[in-house]
């Protein structure tokens, strides 16, 4: 009977060890599942960050292109006063008469209206760059 009692005690220890292993395995399974969910969330966040960085690259490129459009203008183009003064000097120097003078006056009036406007940068247009649509 001693051998049977010893075998029962050994089997009970094995059962307790297996139950501990099972509970530890279940805990490990839960932790791995949580880790998997966190990794998926990090992947989605990384995609969001990548998309955000692409958007900023697009914004910077658009700003760069708009600023390149301004390079064609000199600093004096933004000063309205010298334009008016130069037109007055030109009109004082011209001593044309007859129809030519009247035509020049009409052209000068049209030019004065155009020259009173300060040059503006190129219009920026929003263009969707992702391939979804």
Curated annotation (Swiss-Prot):
InterPro entries: DASH_Dad2. Keywords: Acetylation, Cell cycle, Cell division, Centromere, Chromosome, Chromosome partition, Coiled coil, Cytoplasm, Cytoskeleton, Kinetochore, Microtubule, Mitosis, Nucleus. The keyword Coiled coil applies. It is found in: Nucleus; Cytoplasm, Cytoskeleton, Spindle; Chromosome, Centromere, Kinetochore; Chromosome. GO terms for cellular component: cytoplasm; DASH complex; microtubule; mitotic spindle; mitotic spindle midzone; mitotic spindle pole body. Residues 106-117 have a biased composition (Acidic residues). The modification N-acetylmethionine is found at residue 1. Residues 1-51 form a coiled coil. The keyword Acetylation applies. Residues 81-133 are annotated as: Disordered. One of its GO terms (biological process) is cell division. Residues 82-92 have a biased composition (Basic and acidic residues). Present with 279 molecules/cell in log phase SD medium. Component of the DASH complex consisting of ASK1, DAD1, DAD2, DAD3, DAD4, DAM1, DUO1, HSK3, SPC19 and SPC34, with a stoichiometry of one copy of each subunit per complex. Multiple DASH complexes oligomerize to form a ring that encircles spindle microtubules and organizes the rod-like NDC80 complexes of the outer kinetochore. DASH complex oligomerization strengthens microtubule attachments. On cytoplasmic microtubules, DASH complexes appear to form patches instead of rings. Belongs to the DASH complex DAD2 family. Component of the DASH complex that connects microtubules with kinetochores and couples microtubule depolymerisation to chromosome movement; it is involved in retrieving kinetochores to the spindle poles before their re-orientation on the spindle in early mitosis and allows microtubule depolymerization to pull chromosomes apart and resist detachment during anaphase. This is DASH complex subunit DAD2. It comes from Saccharomyces cerevisiae (strain ATCC 204508 / S288c) (Baker's yeast). The lineage of its organism: Eukaryota, Fungi, Dikarya, Ascomycota, Saccharomycotina.
């Amino acid at each position: 009977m001693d051998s049977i009692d010893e075998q029962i005690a050994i089997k009970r220890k094995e059962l307790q060890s297996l139950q501990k292993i099972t509970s530890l395995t279940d805990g490990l399974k839960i932790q791995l599942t949580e880790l998997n969910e966190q990794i998926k969330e990090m992947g989605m966040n990384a995609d969001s960050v990548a998309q955000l960085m692409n958007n900023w690259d697009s914004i910077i490129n658009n700003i760069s292109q708009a600023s390149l459009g301004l390079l064609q203008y000199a600093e004096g183009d933004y000063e309205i006063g010298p334009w008016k003064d130069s037109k007055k000097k030109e009109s004082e120097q011209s001593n044309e008469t007859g129809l030519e003078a009247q035509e020049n006056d009409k052209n000068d009036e049209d030019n004065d209206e155009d020259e009173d406007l300060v040059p503006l940068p190129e219009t920026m247009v929003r263009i969707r760059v992702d391939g979804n649509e």
